From Swiss-Prot:
It is a multi-pass membrane protein. It is found in: Cellular thylakoid membrane. Keywords: Cytochrome c-type biogenesis, Membrane, Thylakoid, Transmembrane, Transmembrane helix. This is Cytochrome c biogenesis protein CcsA. One of its GO terms (molecular function) is heme binding. It comes from Synechococcus sp. (strain CC9605). One of its GO terms (cellular component) is plasma membrane-derived thylakoid membrane.
Length: 304
């Protein structure tokens, strides 16, 4: 019997965890058997709905947007990761996407549900510095950008796993989802028409990773700028070299380097994928590592 809103919030998170725990092995089985992953998408979609209900209930329970402590931000990140996964799968409904992305949402909600003590899972009043309309603008955009960058980087990791030293042609782009068109000469009339050519699995992953990371990078930029404006309003300084700020800048630079290699150098395949995987590690340090230090304005506190 669920007697309190807190118990219902945690139960919704646990239910989403169970669904993702079921979805992950099914996704890997679908990849190995080369079958469709419709059931996996259904499980992830229902889990996302449960996370949505969890966040709404937590918002009602606490009286503020549910992103003010580590538990709430992990639940929000799980919601954003599963939503990003569903959007990417809509562009390319392959079980490889589910196999690559589902572990991230699962890891976030598992950490929130099982690794954090009850006092960090409980709702608490906002500290005065966070009682600002910038909270929703800055933190939510940063968290959604993390979700897009994490999912995009996991797709890059999938490129490294599926790549067998294949050379990718420079024919995929950030626009389009399933293939490209090339000029083909028609023998009987000599006219030129556009003929659709399907991308390989590796090219699809490479293109989807690039597009997802591009969206995440743009949102990260907006999040950092909005945070600087908020900091200036609250403390009179745009930048204070707080540990989280420093690592957010490092994260931005890593993904800026990734996009530079794609746009200016024309890299595709393994080389930019390696840069994206470095970004995956940097996000982990920026998001979780800073909290282990227990210092800085952005730290959610020491929890060990």
């Amino acid at each position: 019997m669920l007697n309190t809103p807190f118990e219902l919030v945690t139960s919704l998170g646990f239910a989403g965890f169970v669904l993702l725990l079921l979805a992950m092995p099914l996704a890997f089985w679908a990849v190995s058997s080369q079958s469709r992953a419709g059931l996996v998408r259904l499980l992830v979609a229902v889990a996302n709905l449960l996370f949505t209900a969890q966040l709404i209930l937590r918002w009602w329970q606490s009286g503020h947007f549910p992103i003010s402590n580590l538990y709430e931000s992990l639940c929000f990140l799980a919601w954003a990761c599963t939503l990003t996964q569903l959007l990417v799968e809509r562009a390319w409904p392959s079980p490889i996407v589910a196999a690559a992305a589902t572990p991230m949402g699962l890891g976030c909600i598992a950490f929130a549900s099982f690794a954090l003590p009850d006092q960090l899972q409980s709702a608490a009043p906002l500290v005065p510095a966070l009682r600002s309309s910038w909270l929703v603008m800055h933190v939510s955009v940063i968290m959604v950008s993390y979700a897009a960058l994490l999912v995009g980087s996991l797709l890059s990791l999938a490129v490294l796993v599926t790549d067998r030293d294949q050379s990718l042609e420079l024919r995929s782009s950030s626009i389009g989802s399933g293939g490209f068109r090339q000029a083909a000469s028609i023998a009987n009339g000599g006219s030129v028409q556009l003929q659709s050519v399907q991308l390989s699995t590796n090219e699809q992953l490479d293109s989807l990773s690039y597009r997802t990371i591009t969206v995440g990078f743009l949102m990260l930029t907006v999040g950092i700028v909005s945070g600087a404006v908020w900091a200036n309003e609250a403390w009179g300084s745009y930048w204070s070299w707080d540990p989280k700020e420093t690592w957010a800048l490092i994260c931005w630079l890593v993904y800026a380097a990734y996009l530079h290699t794609r746009l200016s150098r024309g890299w595709q395949g393994r080389r930019p994928a390696l840069v994206a995987v470095v970004g995956l590690v940097v996000i982990a340090v920026c998001y979780i590592g800073v909290n282990l230090l227990g210092i800085g304005l952005h730290s959610y506190g020491w929890f060990f």
